[in-house]
Amino acid sequence: MFRIVTDTSANLPTAYLQQEHITIIPFTFHADGDEQACLDLNTFDANTFYAQMRSGTKVSTSQIPPQRYLDVLNPMLEAGEDVLFVSMSSGISGSYASGQIAARQLREEFPARKLLLVDTYSASLGEGLLVMRAVDCRREGMSIDDTYTLLRSLRHRMAQIFTVDDLRYLRRTGRLSN
């Protein structure tokens, strides 16, 4: 048995996360300098977020810092649990790299424990589907190593397509460069 941890980008319902004992590490965003955590789909008000962007409020997102990973993962490893972290794509966020920094430190502190990070190459439901597959693997009794290997294989079999109404919002939040 192993713990599954992901970030809020997975967009999974809170009831599912609780039922399957999945821990979430939240992303944060800033609206006019005010930091707000995106904890889950129940507490994050997407309508307000997008209305703020449309009204000209300066909104920016930020990656999960290494310390937040340490705060969440350390107690799990300390309790003798192995952890599989399923992350948003490293291509659109630095959070996976932050997770790697924290993981290096934690592996030194807990050499007997396994801490494996999966870069999903996805976001939103693509990431969420891999989290759900990890839950299925755990339920079926697969090892953390076999689950990790499977997820790394499956991430190459997905493609995500999205559209936006206006590119300026991607530019404002740092998701689109000049």
Locations of the language-model features?
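Mixed-charge interfacial surface used for oligomerization/domain docking
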Residues: 3, 9-17, 22-36, 91, ...
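Class I S-adenosyl-L-methionine
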Residues: 36-109
